[in-house]
């Protein structure tokens, strides 16, 4: 009808009129007041600037009817067009799954004239498009509200059961509700959103209530002899299902649980619980009483859901957390020579055994009575795990610094002398670590010479004289370099940590002479410089001055020395020993600084050395620590093993790492 209409196309009709099949909604895109007609297939797309600005009224955007009231340029898309262009109404109905726009546009001749200067000032097109893949609403985002309402019809199975009280018989009552129900055993279920059963006829109310299977008329049902099983798939013995969020029961009163089933009343097939006395005793899950719930994920004999307690550790290795306390896993004191691999969790706070002996090592066993710096080895003397008292010692998190003995002020600060100092007082029970200098050097340089040692401790850098007893393996290492020995440790004054040694390098500088340590210390961890033998000499290993003659000492793994730990024994310097021999990564007794366990790697060798028995509080021979993590000399650790055998701590890491 284009030719019959006085339509002035903005362009010549050959170009302006588009022939083609009807357009789906996706062919129109509206941008910048331009109607972009995407012609399907071979059709030509015309862009006409709409002279009439399209004013969109977002009227029905929300109800899946997009009403575009606009002075839209009269774009006429091919369709059955019976209307002239000036007052056409394009109604596109969103038929589900139909993406065809039925335009009552003029031009049955398959010519759609696009009136660019269209007179269609007040043209309203109602587009109801059936979920087109792309629908362009002018300034109105397509809002397809598909409201699907699902009416839940619970699948209720009624199990015919004898009436709980005589005189109540359930007749087959026709369902009186919107829904239809399935009934078994002569019960009719009314599947309604709400319903109540009078005499088995639903009373269509917001909640079902049963008196004696009669309605109790309440929003929450109470049942005299009926029990509601309010759950999605309930099975009711006596009464029809009462599906509500809460119920109170006359005889069989469920205690208002979301999951309850009642034994006398009816077993409800649920994952919840059944109750013998009709009172649910366990909210969560369980079976109760004599009736077993039809479908139950858990059943408990006594109506009590299993109470989840903290797991008890069978394998004695408590979970790692900051402060575990182990009741039975650990022997209360070290005396029991071994414990079941009780590896305490690694923690940064030191833990102190409550049995910490007064200053001075306990005799006979290496009790870790000092702060256990961060790591307890699972050693035969399982330290008694008492809730660690917070000691000022702060242990930095474990950082594998196997190679270096960098001076870390933090260590000095955070790690008190773990070893008993020369002072006679061992750590008090309070387990306060003895105050030690905050600098790693200071802590490191406890060089009190242990008197009791049969062999003189090499306080000065002079090579330590051979001790009467062979030191544990001298950790033979490459010849000690002629490093100037640090000044002898004449006194227990803390000495700065010697520079990090590489394994390759002998430990030329003496390790800080620490007071004789009762505990052999694992050989120096593999530091870039090999340390002279860190044979755990109970004697202070004041100067790791590498002896010129690196004679490999026999490795008496225990490295135990008779000396008491009373003095803050510095971990024996690698050079110290009857014949300190520098060695690279040689296995030997390594002493670890407990304070540095986290950061240290094996100093000298990977031997696990057995703590030496010290007369005063010797480490038990069973204490085996992995030397790999042991620190070599306390000297470079910056901490003396004050109050504790270094051996006890040395290599403690092995247990955890």
UniProtKB/Swiss-Prot annotation:
<dbReference type="InterPro" id="IPR052881">
    <property type="entry name" value="Keratinocyte_PR"/>
</dbReference>
<dbReference type="GO" id="GO:0061436">
    <property type="term" value="P:establishment of skin barrier"/>
</dbReference>
<dbReference type="GO" id="GO:0002934">
    <property type="term" value="P:desmosome organization"/>
</dbReference>
<feature type="compositionally biased region" description="Pro residues">
    <location>
        <begin position="539"/>
        <end position="561"/>
    </location>
</feature>
<feature type="modified residue" description="Phosphoserine">
    <location>
        <position position="442"/>
    </location>
</feature>
<dbReference type="GO" id="GO:0006954">
    <property type="term" value="P:inflammatory response"/>
</dbReference>
<feature type="region of interest" description="Disordered">
    <location>
        <begin position="517"/>
        <end position="568"/>
    </location>
</feature>
<feature type="compositionally biased region" description="Pro residues">
    <location>
        <begin position="517"/>
        <end position="530"/>
    </location>
</feature>
<feature type="compositionally biased region" description="Low complexity">
    <location>
        <begin position="292"/>
        <end position="302"/>
    </location>
</feature>
<dbReference type="GO" id="GO:0043588">
    <property type="term" value="P:skin development"/>
</dbReference>
<dbReference type="GO" id="GO:0008544">
    <property type="term" value="P:epidermis development"/>
</dbReference>
<keyword id="KW-0963">Cytoplasm</keyword>
<protein>
    <recommendedName>
        <fullName>Keratinocyte proline-rich protein</fullName>
    </recommendedName>
</protein>
<keyword id="KW-0597">Phosphoprotein</keyword>
<feature type="compositionally biased region" description="Pro residues">
    <location>
        <begin position="449"/>
        <end position="493"/>
    </location>
</feature>
<feature type="region of interest" description="Disordered">
    <location>
        <begin position="425"/>
        <end position="493"/>
    </location>
</feature>
<feature type="compositionally biased region" description="Basic and acidic residues">
    <location>
        <begin position="434"/>
        <end position="444"/>
    </location>
</feature>
<dbReference type="GO" id="GO:0005737">
    <property type="term" value="C:cytoplasm"/>
</dbReference>
<feature type="region of interest" description="Disordered">
    <location>
        <begin position="285"/>
        <end position="320"/>
    </location>
</feature>
């Amino acid at each position: 009808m284009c030719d019959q209409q006085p339509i002035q196309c903005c362009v010549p009709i050959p170009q302006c009129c588009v022939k083609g099949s009807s357009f789906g909604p996706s062919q129109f895109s509206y941008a910048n007041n331009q109607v972009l007609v995407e012609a399907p297939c071979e059709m030509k797309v015309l862009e006409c600037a709409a002279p009439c600005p399209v004013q969109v009224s977002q009227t029905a955007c929300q109800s899946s009817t997009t009403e575009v009231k606009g002075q839209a340029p009269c774009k006429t898309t091919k369709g059955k067009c019976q209307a002239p262009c000036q007052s056409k109404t394009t109604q596109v109905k969103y038929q589900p799954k139909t993406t065809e726009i039925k335009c009552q546009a003029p031009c049955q001749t398959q010519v759609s004239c696009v009136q660019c200067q269209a007179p269609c000032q007040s043209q309203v097109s109602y587009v109801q498009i059936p979920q087109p893949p792309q629908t362009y609403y002018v300034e109105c985002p397509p809002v397809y509200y598909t409201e699907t309402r699902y009416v839940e019809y619970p699948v209720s199975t009624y199990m015919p059961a004898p009436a709980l009280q005589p005189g109540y018989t359930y007749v087959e009552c026709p369902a009186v509700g919107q829904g239809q129900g399935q009934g078994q055993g002569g019960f009719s279920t009314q599947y309604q959103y709400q319903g109540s059963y009078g005499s088995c006829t639903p009373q269509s109310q917001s909640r079902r209530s049963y008196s004696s299977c009669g309605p109790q008329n309440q929003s929450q049902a109470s049942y005299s002899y009926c029990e509601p099983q309010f759950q999605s798939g309930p099975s009711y013995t006596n009464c029809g299902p009462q599906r509500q969020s809460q119920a109170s029961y006359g005889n069989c009163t469920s205690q208002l649980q979301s999951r309850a089933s009642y034994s006398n009343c009816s077993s409800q097939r649920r994952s919840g619980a059944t109750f013998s006395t009709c009172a649910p005793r366990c909210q969560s899950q369980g079976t109760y009483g004599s009736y077993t719930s039809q479908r139950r994920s858990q059943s408990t004999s006594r109506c009590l859901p299993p109470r989840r307690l903290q797991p008890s550790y069978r394998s004695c290795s408590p979970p790692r957390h900051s402060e575990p306390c182990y009741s039975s896993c650990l022997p209360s004191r070290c005396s029991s020579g071994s414990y079941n691999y009780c590896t305490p969790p690694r923690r940064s706070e030191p833990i102190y055994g409550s049995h910490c002996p007064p200053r001075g090592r306990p005799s006979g066993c290496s009790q870790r009575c000092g702060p256990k710096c961060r790591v307890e080895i699972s050693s035969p003397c399982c330290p008694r795990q008492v809730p660690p008292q917070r000691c000022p010692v702060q242990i930095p998190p474990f950082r594998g610094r196997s190679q270096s003995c960098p001076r870390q002020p933090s260590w000095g600060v955070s790690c008190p002398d773990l070893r008993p100092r020369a002072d006679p007082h061992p750590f008090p029970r309070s387990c306060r670590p003895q105050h030690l200098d905050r600098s790693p050097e200071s802590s490191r340089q406890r060089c009190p010479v242990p008197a009791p040692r049969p062999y003189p401790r090499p306080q000065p850098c002079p090579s330590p004289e051979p001790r009467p007893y062979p030191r544990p393996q001298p950790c033979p290492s490459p010849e000690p370099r002629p490093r100037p020995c640090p000044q002898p440790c004449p006194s227990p004054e803390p000495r700065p940590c010697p520079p990090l040694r590489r394994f390759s390098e002998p430990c030329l500088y003496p390790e800080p002479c620490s007071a004789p340590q009762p505990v052999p210390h694992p050989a120096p961890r593999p530091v870039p410089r090999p340390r002279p033998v860190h044979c755990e000499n109970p004697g202070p290993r004041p100067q790791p001055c590498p002896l010129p003659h690196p004679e490999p000492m026999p490795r008496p793994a225990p490295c135990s020395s008779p000396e008491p730990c009373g003095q803050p024994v510095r971990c024996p310097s690698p050079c110290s020993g009857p014949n300190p021999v520098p060695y690279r990564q040689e296995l030997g007794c390594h002493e670890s600084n407990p304070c540095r366990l986290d950061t240290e790697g094996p100093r000298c060798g990977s031997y696990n050395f057995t703590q030496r028995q010290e007369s005063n509080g010797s480490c038990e021979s069973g204490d085996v620590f992995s030397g790999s993590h042991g620190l070599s000399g306390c000297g470079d650790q910056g901490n003396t093993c004050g109050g504790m055998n270094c051996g006890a701590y040395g290599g403690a890491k092995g247990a955890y790492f």
